[in-house]
């Protein structure tokens, strides 16, 4: 099964030529180039590939958050896509997006263990953006839950909390994250 990544949420139709307002969920708008293959589906369709319908990008105006797809030329056709998600395959995203040193794809961070002072606090199950700050949603290790700590807690993606991300070791080392867990 192809892994799909949410690029944005499609808003209302704009204009008479099938334009779509795009609420970007990605840090890489440069991936939205003419000719790039994308898919549209309900936002909860991550695991139901039959829900995805393929399209090709005609253009994207980042300053206006305006997306045009090659086969959508009327407001009526555009309205059919309102409130759906715009997705791109993980492979296509990684091919088109050039990461700087220290940057990561969300999909590579989900599933990593969170470790502080050689103690596993849990694993990253999701990443959320709240007020321009990314947060790791961490499912707490069972042994810590049994001690009465929260089942889920959030760690801001800030240097104060995140010491190092080691993809090869499948772990994120932290400072001060256990305090967040204890106070959750």
From Swiss-Prot:
It comes from the Bacteria. GO terms for cellular component: cytoplasm; ribosome. Keywords: Chaperone, Cytoplasm, Ribosome biogenesis, rRNA processing. The keyword Flavoprotein does not apply. Its main location: cytoplasm. Residues 101-180 form the PRC barrel domain. InterPro entries: PRC-brl_dom, PRC_barrel-like_sf, RimM, RimM_N, RimM_N_sf, Transl_B-barrel_sf. GO terms for biological process: ribosomal small subunit biogenesis; rRNA processing. It is found in: Cytoplasm. Pfam families: PRC, RimM. GO terms for molecular function: ribosome binding. SUPFAM superfamilies: PRC-barrel domain, Translation proteins. The PRC barrel domain binds ribosomal protein uS19. An accessory protein needed during the final step in the assembly of 30S ribosomal subunit, possibly for assembly of the head region. Essential for efficient processing of 16S rRNA. May be needed both before and after RbfA during the maturation of 16S rRNA. It has affinity for free ribosomal 30S subunits but not for 70S ribosomes. Belongs to the RimM family. Binds ribosomal protein uS19. This is Ribosome maturation factor RimM. The lineage of its organism: Bacteria, Pseudomonadati, Campylobacterota, Epsilonproteobacteria, Campylobacterales.
């Amino acid at each position: 099964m192809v892994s799909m990544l949410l690029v944005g949420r499609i808003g209302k139709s704009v204009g008479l030529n099938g334009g779509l307002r795009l609420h970007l969920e990605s840090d890489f708008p440069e991936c939205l180039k003419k000719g790039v293959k994308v898919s549209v589906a309900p936002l909860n369709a991550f695991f139901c590939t039959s829900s995805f319908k393929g399209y090709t990008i005609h253009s994207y105006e980042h300053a206006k958050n305006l997306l045009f797809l090659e086969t959508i030329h009327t407001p009526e056709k555009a309205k059919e896509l309102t409130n759906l998600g715009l997705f791109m395959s993980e492979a296509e995203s990684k091919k088109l997006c050039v990461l700087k040193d220290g940057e990561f794809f969300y999909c590579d961070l989900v599933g990593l263990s969170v470790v502080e002072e050689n103690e596993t606090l849990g694993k990253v199950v999701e990443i959320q953006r709240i007020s321009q700050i990314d947060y790791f949603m961490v499912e707490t290790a069972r042994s810590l839950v049994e001690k009465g700590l929260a089942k889920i807690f959030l760690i801001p993606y800030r240097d104060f909390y995140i010491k190092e991300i080691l993809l090869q070791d499948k772990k994120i080392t932290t400072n001060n994250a256990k305090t967040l867990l204890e106070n959750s």
